[in-house]
Amino acid sequence: DKDHPIRNWTEHQREVFSVDWNNIQKELFMSCSWDGNVKIVRVYTDQWHPERPASIQTLPPHGACVYKAAWSPHDPTVLATACGDGNMRLFDTRIPAARPVATMGVGGEVLSLDWNKYRRMTLASGSSDRTVKTWDIRAQPAPAQSVLTGHTYAVRCVTWSAHQSNILATAGYDMTARIWNVDD
């Protein structure tokens, strides 16, 4: 039925900004919100009931809007968040209380992030300071691998190519979409 979703969650206290499916543990889904929370839901379960909370895990509050949360395409327990406090955080859901295993200070509100599909330890971020940064998360604290400039307003979206490990697409509030070769 096109007018009725098969599942509906109402656990967030503010607008939900982003959702993402876990590509490895296919029953896991997460949402993030302006309320600063990230909620992980096991979608396909017989215990689901519309009057009970559906989330199986809530990450510690970020203290600011979480604009984007994305599962790693390489590890089913690892995810990254892009936050309005200027930080990108990495979480391993196996760690008790799900504290961040790493925090990267990006600068400006972090509006977007994306995992590289081929380079398992590489992330890209886009932020309100008009920069795009790539990160090698093996080094902690992780310095930015590259800083791409050129957008004249905030960078709202970053997406790695599904076909080439070095190609990154970005979109900004400057009304432009750009393609970058991060190896140049």
What residue spans do the PLM features occupy?
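Loop-centered beta-sheet repeat module
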Residues: 59-91
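Loop/turn segments within WD40 beta-propeller blades
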Residues: 19-26, 70-76, 114-120, 159-165
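Conserved strand-to-loop turn within each blade of WD40 beta-propeller repeats
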Residues: 31-35, 42, 82-85, 93, ...
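WD40-repeat beta-propellers
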Residues: 1, 38-44, 88-93, 113, ...
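A short beta-strand motif characteristic of beta-propeller blades
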Residues: 4-9, 54-59, 99-103, 143-148
